[in-house]
């Protein structure tokens, strides 16, 4: 996964800096039917959302992972988990939540009109080889000893680290960078062996700089068009030297630790289920919190199609770019998940689910 603290997520960092809106555009899923909120969380009689959550099975799987991997976290939240699952077994109608002892606290959103930001992240699968050969020329490194300041990305690309720290060679410098930014990935050595999981091992200590912002500042990509796909397309249409120069603008560099097999885990040390878990700002959304989210649906070009789906998700991860009323939805593993993650910089409504009555302080775990 992205490691416990590394989440300088490509999209979280790229899209978090995209322009805040002074008007009320709706092309990214914003809604304004609930009026203005005056506090971060507002207790509502029932979520004003049509339909039932579409991912009851995935939510149940995520709760099982919490129960098995973190008994303490499960114990802190078991009343909510049990109530929500009983509600789901009865059909999951939002009009009936109170009958199951569930309170819904609507989040105010970044604009105070209930529009909560969604971005996405995923776990890539990287093609690689154990030795440098053919197209496989781009090293993936393990953590070197920290003897003073470690080299910058540009210095590492120039050969500043010994070959003894190389774990594998991939066929794409951009793929390496994306795994670096996501904080982990699966490695396919192409020999029929099971995928290896390369987990986050550390970073070089240099400041992170968004290459998406660099492209925008240079006039290479319009702000409104910025996405992971836009960055990939730019890389595919420019020379290797130009791609390297762009990536070197981000001096931060991540190192990895190979594992024969490991499930993707978040900062809460719980395996993550795609689109049933999120990264959150722990200062307002504690680990294990259950969320009912109205997630905007996107077409194949990443455009909001005017519809939403209700999903239940659990806050199990963190991210350096995830602050305030903003969630990063874990999309899963591989290219399809990456495609979904790459488009998300949209808005929807979110309700924090707690056990009634009132649930006391909604900020407490």
From Swiss-Prot:
| SS bond list | none
Reactions the enzyme catalyzes: Exolytic cleavage of the (1->4)-beta-glycosidic linkage between N-acetylmuramic acid (MurNAc) and N-acetylglucosamine (GlcNAc) residues in peptidoglycan, from either the reducing or the non-reducing ends of the peptidoglycan chains, with concomitant formation of a 1,6-anhydrobond in the MurNAc residue
Q: Gene3D superfamilies per the record? A: Barwin-like endoglucanases, RlpA-like domain
Which Pfam families does this one have? 3D, MltA
Q: Where is the lipid attached (N-palmitoyl cysteine)?
A: 21
Q: How does activity depend on pH?
A: Optimum pH is 4.0-4.5.
Signal peptide, first to last residue: 1-20
Predominant localisation class? membrane
- Places the protein is found: Cell outer membrane
Membrane-related topology note:
Lipid-anchor
Lipidated residues (S-diacylglycerol cysteine)? 21
EC numbers listed for it are 4.2.2.n1
The UniProt keyword set, sorted, is: Cell outer membrane, Cell wall biogenesis/degradation, Lipoprotein, Lyase, Membrane, Palmitate, Signal
Q: Name one GO biological process term.
A: peptidoglycan metabolic process
Q: How does activity depend on temperature?
A: Loses rapidly its activity at temperatures above 30 degrees Celsius.
One annotated GO molecular function: hydrolase activity, hydrolyzing O-glycosyl compounds
Listed SMART domains: MltA (SM00925)
EC class of this enzyme?
Answer: lyase
User: Tell me, what does this protein do in biology?
Assistant: Murein-degrading enzyme. May play a role in recycling of muropeptides during cell elongation and/or cell division. Degrades murein glycan strands and insoluble, high-molecular weight murein sacculi.
Subunit architecture: Forms a trimeric complex with MrcB/PonB and MipA in vitro.
What is the name attached to this protein's record?
Membrane-bound lytic murein transglycosylase A
Q: What is the lineage of its organism?
A: Bacteria, Pseudomonadati, Pseudomonadota, Gammaproteobacteria, Enterobacterales
